[in-house]
Amino acid sequence: MPYEYFYNREPEQYVHYQMPSILFEDDNLRELSINAKFLYSVLLDRAKLSYKNGWLDDDGKVYIHYAQADLIKLLNCGRTKMSEYFNELDGDKGGVGLIERKQKVGIGKNDKIYVKNFAKPTNESISLLDTPQSPFDYFHN
């Protein structure tokens, strides 16, 4: 099927998932698979909506619900692969710690997922803390 070109401001009419560039630049995050990075971006997008809807726990932390079946369809993968992508992100499953899942309670309930802030690491060994003070510090003569 042939596709048309974009003209003028037409590209602005679409919703886009934003993928933080830090996922490709940070030493602790660049090893994530592209699908895990995309999954994090989708979850981050959902977290914005959850905040707008007031989905905060008692500590004020934003959480999301996302049906696994919907994510499987979005990423066009199977249940096993989706589990692998989640495990890459979930610190409790040996991943990088960008998400935390609280198990669902009851049949038909989705896990409560906390999408963590990549810009505010809690572990001082994370290389984000070594970020130069000035953007010009990246350049060397």
Model-assigned labels for residue ranges:
Residues 23, 60, 75, 86, ...:
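Generic low-complexity, intrinsically disordered sequence content enriched
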Residues 34, 46-113:
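Winged helix-turn-helix DNA-binding recognition segment
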